[in-house]
């Protein structure tokens, strides 16, 4: 009996020792610190990839800001140009008070016959005419090479033919300097009327009567008898 009890106690002690060693080896194999370290190395991104991502994000943000700025500048420029055009049109069309000339009181435009006598030139950037600028102040558009420009007398300011013709249908002044064109138109129309009068005056007819010649024989007889 004693031998059996000793053998069973020895087997039990051996089993407990074996189980303890197994558990300790298992704990060594499954070290939580090593697992966390491996996970950290596996999850942590590369510094180079992070830098490239940050750089791409900065470039996209910078491009977005530049595009938005350009769009805002273009929109603001368009709004200012439209406002300036409206203001200029209003100032040009506003009648001038206190003028003693007929230009201040007449709403009738220039006679078409006189208007057609104003010179028209073909615009070229190389032209150096006094008073001719680079844009039409009526439509606020730059002159283009080959466009027909009508020049006003006296002030020599130039405008698009379609713009100045429409303007002078209702006004008698230059839209840029307000020079009155009534006197010039009257002079042109006066020259026209004088030319018409000269053309309409009938020329005096001169009647020349030629007497028939007498026969030569009769003349000789008359001379002998005398």
Swiss-Prot record:
Coiled coil: none annotated. The keyword RNA-binding does not apply. The RING-type zinc finger domain mediates binding to an E2 ubiquitin-conjugating enzyme. One of its GO terms (cellular component) is membrane. The gene is ATL75. Pfam families: zf-RING_2. It comes from Arabidopsis thaliana (Mouse-ear cress). Pathway: Protein modification; protein ubiquitination. PANTHER family: E3 UBIQUITIN-PROTEIN LIGASE ATL76-RELATED, RING-H2 FINGER PROTEIN ATL78. GO terms for biological process: protein ubiquitination. This is RING-H2 finger protein ATL75. Keywords: Membrane, Metal-binding, Transferase, Transmembrane, Transmembrane helix, Ubl conjugation pathway, Zinc, Zinc-finger. A zinc finger (RING-type) spans 136-178. GO terms for molecular function: transferase activity; zinc ion binding.
